[in-house]
Amino acid sequence: MSTENNAPVVNNFIRSIIDEDLATGRRSSVVTRFPPEPNGFAHIGHAKAICINFGLAEDYNGQCNLRMDDTNPEKESDEFVEAFKQDISWLGFKWNGEVRYASDYFDRLYDYAVELIQAGKAYVDDLSAEEMRQYRGNLTEPGKNSPYRDRTPEENLDLFTRMKNGEFPDGSKTLRLKIDMASGNINLRDPAIYRIRRVHHHRTGDKWCIYPMYDYTHCISDAIEGITHSLCSLEFEDHRPLYDWVLDNISIEHHPQQIEFSRLELLYALTSKRKLQALVNDGAVTGWDDPRMPTIAGMRRRGYSPAGIKLFAQRIGVSKSENIIDMAILEGAVRETLENDSPRVMAVVNPLKVTLTNYDAAVTASRSAPFHPHHPEFGERDVPIAREIWIERDDFAETPPPKWQRLTAGGEVRLRYSYVIKCDEVVKDAADEIVELKCSIDHDTLGKNPEGRKVKGVIHWVSAEHAIQADVRWYERLFTEQRPDAVRGEDGEYVDFRQFLNPESLKLVPAYVEASVLQAEPESRFQFERLGYFVTDRYEHRKGDKAVFNRTVGLKDSWK
């Protein structure tokens, strides 16, 4: 699949199938589709599918359709449609033509159902949902035919027409395919393809009171759109015979090939829209785009880049094997792309006051510093110094451990892009807490090493006079368990995944940051030197007024 970096394209079995199809003339082009249900926001699992479908279409100079699978109107909305469109565009992909909807094909789907009824291949059933389950059988026992299975095509057509016209109550009748109740594949045991459901649809309004089922809708929609390779996750492998049966038994010429790949399971995260919705509803997160959420909108707000997400999708590859991926792989891909693209600035998140006792405005000079050590085109910024500065409290130790190279009483350290300073005095309050360090500058060390001694430590800092205050949201992983929805209690039942929410997943940290960041636009990514990668918040950062940062990821994996 396509990525924005120079990493090699990973071979996958889908690519091999496409290569053979094109080489043999079975297909002359590649048309894929991404068909989400608009009942929530896109998450990291969708991101993988997006990269596969759109990426393969790009690589083969083909096309990828965006189609909303809107056959379940109770849970779907225009809000989720727009969210999917935004996320796909933000990732850098373009769909073919206009956004398509399964509901665009409701009339044609109905006509094909009539065709199946007339051919004696579908029937109206009066069994209740519970009765249908009892008749279906299981993996070891065949199902039983419904007592309504042998209705004539004429009777079935009359009943189906009346279903459409609203003459029967919700759930009282279904339209089922007549396949084989003894099939070893339960999906072929006369699956229902229409149900009565009086629900307002976000696009068709109240026109329909019957709605087609996913398995029926999906394959026909693919065929209508001329999809060549219908790529879906592995749980639909057992549905493929039904996909093929429907298309083989209606008067439609095009027959796409369904190909399944393993779905993504990301450790320390959830990829169930239902469970993510529960987190939103419970107030465990601030919304679908909370930076702790594994949604594309959440990852975007946290500062993940499209290139990082694409690199992640490319690295995990495409296979039929179980695809359980550690969060560190995602964070590593994001970190790698941010390292190359992020300007550097200094920020202090746990400040300790330092007074430079021999600071003299006439002789104490400031320097400029590059925004990126390897990209001179990023430019430079001024790093002003003043009599009072802030350093990280963690960069001072009154009683240092072995091999300590940062500041200590009587010790020296270099201020990044500035002078070597020496701690001459430690000031404490009545509670014996350190509140200030009094240090002296070696004025001969600006841009050069001190004479006769070696100073190894370098720390970051900001000028108390020039730095701005910023709100920093320090994010960690949302869950403490690798697989929060797969933990069983002593009774053998699954434990509520919400019990494993990380109470330390968000800390609000007041910080001091170089003044240049105040002019940054929302969604500007930075490396805070020695601290990690941060982004100005998409909504709450206000250029020239209020600086709000979200922690994206650390400089290295801290969860090993």
UniProtKB/Swiss-Prot annotation:
Q: Name one Pfam family in it.
A: tRNA-synt_1c_C2
Record motif 'HIGH' region, residues: 36-46
Member of which family? Answer: Belongs to the class-I aminoacyl-tRNA synthetase family.
| Primary subcellular site in the record, as a coarse category | cytoplasm
Protein name, please? Glutamine--tRNA ligase
What parts of the sequence cross the membrane? none
> Source taxonomy lineage?
Bacteria, Pseudomonadati, Pseudomonadota, Betaproteobacteria, Neisseriales
> Which keywords has UniProt assigned to this entry?
Aminoacyl-tRNA synthetase, ATP-binding, Cytoplasm, Ligase, Nucleotide-binding, Protein biosynthesis
Binding positions (L-glutamine): D69, Y214
